[in-house]
Amino acid sequence: MDYDPNTNPFDLHFSGKLPKREVSASASKVVEKKWLVKDEKRNMLQDEINRVNSENKKLTEMLARVCEKYYALNNLMEELQSRKSPESVNFQNKQLTGKRKQELDEFVSSPIGLSLGPIENITNDKATVSTAYFAAEKSDTSLTVKDGYQWRKYGQKITRDNPSPRAYFRCSFSPSCLVKKKVQRSAEDPSFLVATYEGTHNHTGPHASVSRTVKLDLVQGGLEPVEEKKERGTIQEVLVQQMASSLTKDPKFTAALATAISGRLIEHSRT
């Protein structure tokens, strides 16, 4: 019997050679799989962030368009509400085409009636909106006009197209009388206050107006006659001249009209 000195006599299963130590491949596969899962989750999160950013950008652009449309509609509404003011004469003139333009030309060339009264103003009967112009000192910031009626002020704000604030009034007979008015200094001619009236008074004014304005009905194509007042003089002439100067800034529309009104008012006031 051969004896091997390297043999452990107590190890019954010893084959005579030590096994090599090997690293398990399954452990490395598990680690690699975990990294792949993490990379996949990171990519998914990145895609989600990109999607949210893209959606946020679209919503921001949509909100900007909505705001632009809102401001455009708001400006249009204010322009329509004050379309009889000096600032909007040019806008209305551009809208006059065809038959309406012909009627306006016939009105300018026809004899013009005269009107001197407390709040007889440029009137649109269809919209029940009238506008009056009152001469005022540039230093006067009260935005109050003497039109023969009593009013209660309920608000004031700054508009986009005029540095002067706009004041809001209700008739003192409210709620039985629902007439409202807005008063703002003219942006083109600061020597005038522009009063826009909404509605018709269902009562007479408590006081007669000291100032005189001109009533011009652009819908009917003429000046509406009213009761002539006894008080006439230099105040009326100055007011007429100032109105003519303001209107004649648009030579295409108002030159002939302003000249005719100015001449006839001055001629009548001197008689």
Swiss-Prot record:
A biological process term (GO) from this entry: defense response to fungus
Pfam families xref list: WRKY
GO cellular component: nucleus
Gene Ontology molecular functions: DNA-binding transcription factor activity; identical protein binding; sequence-specific DNA binding
DNA-binding region: 140-206
Location relative to the cell: Nucleus
Key words of the record: DNA-binding, Nucleus, Transcription, Transcription regulation
Domain of life: Eukaryota
InterPro entries: WRKY_dom, WRKY_dom_sf, WRKY_plant
Main localisation: nucleus
Role according to the record: Transcription factor. Interacts specifically with the W box (5'-(T)TGAC[CT]-3'), a frequently occurring elicitor-responsive cis-acting element.
Protein name: Probable WRKY transcription factor 60
Gene this protein is translated from: WRKY60
